[in-house]
Amino acid sequence: MAHDVVLIPGDGIGPEITQAMRRVVEATGVQINWNVQEAGAGVMDEFGTPLPQHVLDAVAETKVAIKGPITTPVGTGFRSVNVALRKHFDLYACVRPCLSQPGDGSRFRDVDLVIVRENTEDLYAGIEFDEGAAEVEELSQLVERSGQKTFAADSAISIKPISIAKSRRIVEYAFEYARRCGRKKVTAVHLSLIHI
């Protein structure tokens, strides 16, 4: 049985990387029907956005996508394609397994951990205002009224929302993942000095 997978090659080194990935997948013998969709700087002229709706529709239909690196054109008013994909599909858990391999040359032996990171809040929320935007002035006034340290008039602003609900959701995900995969320990890491 073949599996339908959306492939977003991206731009820059993306097509080269995704082509190598395809060769690796093909070597496994797993049958894949690749639905190649273009996104990033290369589609801006044709579609007026780095992430056209038909790409989102294709991913929604297959529920599986592999994406290469994608450039978001700077100064175009568009958020990062990565952030847009995370928000659109609520891809809140970034799961990164880390496993030592024999002969890898690392000074750290027997590494076997999985990093689970919240992927839609904090700076990943993509709430940003360019220098000179009216929102920057409004935020500056709000900060000043609250008695906090002000920031330079020529600042750009990025807001880092962190909610109880989404914090709880990622913690629950980490514990469920640990149970499901037979892991015995979950460690929370955060920068408390930044958020006091």
Question: How should each PLM-predicted stretch be described?
Answer:
Residues 32-36, 180-189:
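Flexible, glycine/charged-enriched surface loops at secondary-structure junctions
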Residues 1-2, 59-61, 150, 171, ...:
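Glycine-rich phosphate/diphosphate-binding loops that line cofactor/substrate pockets in enzymes
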Residues 11-14, 63, 116, 174:
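Buried hydrophobic positions in well-ordered alpha/beta secondary-structure cores of metabolic enzymes
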Residues 4-10, 65-69, 186-192:
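Short glycine-rich or small-residue beta-strand-to-loop segments that form or flank ligand, phosphate
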Residues 194-196:
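Conserved small/polar residues in nucleotide/adenosyl-binding loops
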Residues 32-52:
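N-terminal beta-loop-helix "entrance" segment that forms/cooperates
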